[in-house]
Design a protein with these regions (language model features):
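Alpha-helical recognition/docking segments in bacterial nutrient-uptake
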Residues: 1-9, 71-75, 79-188, 256
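N-terminal helix-turn-helix DNA-binding module of bacterial transcription factors
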Residues: 1-70, 348
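Flexible loop/turn connectors
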Residues: 7, 248, 252-348
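Short acidic/polar active-site loop segments enriched in Thr and Asp
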Residues: 24, 70, 131, 195-197, ...
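Short beta-strand segments enriched in small/hydrophobic residues
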Residues: 27-29, 67-81, 189, 197-204
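Hinge/beta->alpha junction and helix N-cap segments in small-molecule ligand-binding domains
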Residues: 78-91, 109-117, 174-185, 201-248, ...
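Periplasmic-binding protein-like
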Residues: 130-136, 199-201, 233, 254-264, ...
Length: 348
């Protein structure tokens, strides 16, 4: 037997769907574009005809009618190697994807670290291509937030920008974790276990997370009467290699350190390697606490005590806020800050 679909030449059209459903072309168009100005009976007939014919809407034509692309962008200001190699980014993408499922929005992912990548991204971030934008791993001098706002696109940031950590800065649309509180809890844990010379490997100081975690470390050290001099602070870019190098610096400057709070699990894994190479026992000689509670924390030797941030929940919240902005809604708060907790394992 030959099915109706196989007899239809080429791609099914709106008119063919209307004929099959026994309704007008306008009714089909309203169903396809999500209008509620259609009776339940007519909607059911149209949806049945669409399924039988295998009709796929012309997205370009639909966009002209709805002024929507049904796509959103996630732009990460990091290299492709880091985005696909580090657990944090994978968790964020999983969370965003799950948050967009019910909204039927397609996710467009791009990296924007090099000048060429940034130029391509800038050409794509228009209302003709996407309905909204999420930006992640922003550095202080990144021009993308201002560009997106100037183009009138709904925008949500992953992480509090560095400028918003300064006194008097106004809040924006963002999702973050309690970085200051998490760092304080890490130092509290080290102090409670008898550590008195607590060093830190801080993140980049042109990023909100890097600034906040260092501030939390310093506040907790002051509260416990611990030293926070420059010799106890080294810096890294959240990578494994940076953790290796920063731990070497700390051991050279202050061989008497008995603990270290590290602003990211990958850097903490690098620090553990350097400590082992230096003959330091962990945690007997030096205790180590990381930040993230990524899969890396369970794979290190010894396993890593760390501050847990709910990465996938952060991605889902980013998607929720962006959907609200696209719909023109005004939530009670334009930002979300998620709690952090210390997960105790062998390294501290």
């Amino acid at each position: 037997m030959t099915s109706q679909r196989s007899r239809t030449a080429g791609r099914p059209t709106l008119e063919q769907v209307a004929a099959r459903a026994g309704v007008g072309r306008g009714t089909v168009s309203r169903v396809v574009n999500g209008s509620d100005q259609v009776s339940p009976h007519a909607r059911e007939a149209v949806e049945r005809a669409i399924a039988e014919l295998g009709y796929v809407p012309n997205l370009a034509a639909r966009a002209l009618v709805t002024q929507r692309t049904d796509a959103v962008a996630l732009v990460v200001s990091e290299s492709e190697e880091r985005v696909f190699g580090e657990p944090f980014f994978a968790g964020i993408v999983r969370g965003i994807s799950s948050g967009l499922v019910n909204a039927q929005l397609q996710l467009w992912l791009a990296m924007a670290q090099s000048a060429a990548e940034r130029e391509r991204v800038e050409h794509h971030l228009t209302s003709q291509h996407v309905d909204g934008v999420m930006l992640l791993s922003l550095h202080d001098a990144d021009p993308l937030p201002l560009l997106v706002e100037q183009r009138g696109l709904p925008l949500v940031l992953g992480g509090r920008p560095a400028r918003l950590t300064r006194p008097g800065a106004s809040a924006g649309w963002f999702v973050d974790v309690d970085n200051i509180g998490g760092a304080q809890r890490a130092v509290d844990h080290l102090h409670a276990s008898g550590r008195r010379v607590v060093a830190t490997i801080a993140g980049p100081q042109d990023m909100g997370a890097g600034l906040a975690r260092l501030a939390g470390y310093r506040e907790a050290c002051r509260a416990h009467g611990l030293a926070t001099d420059d010799g106890l602070v080294a810096y890294g870019d959240f990578s494994y290699e940076a953790g290796v190098a920063a731990m070497r610096q700390l051991l050279e400057r202050r061989p008497d350190i008995d603990s270290v709070f590290v602003a990211a699990d990958l850097m903490a894994a690098g620090a553990l390697r350097t400590l082992r190479e230096a003959g330091r026992r962990i945690p007997d000689d030096v205790a180590v606490v990381g930040f993230d509670d990524s899969g890396v924390a369970r794979q290190t030797d010894p396993t890593l005590t760390t501050v847990r941030q709910p990465i996938e929940e952060m991605g889902r919240e980013m998607a929720r806020l962006l959907i609200a902005r696209i719909a023109g809604e005004e939530p009670e708060e334009s930002f979300t800050v998620l709690d952090t907790t210390v997960v105790v394992r062998e390294s501290a």
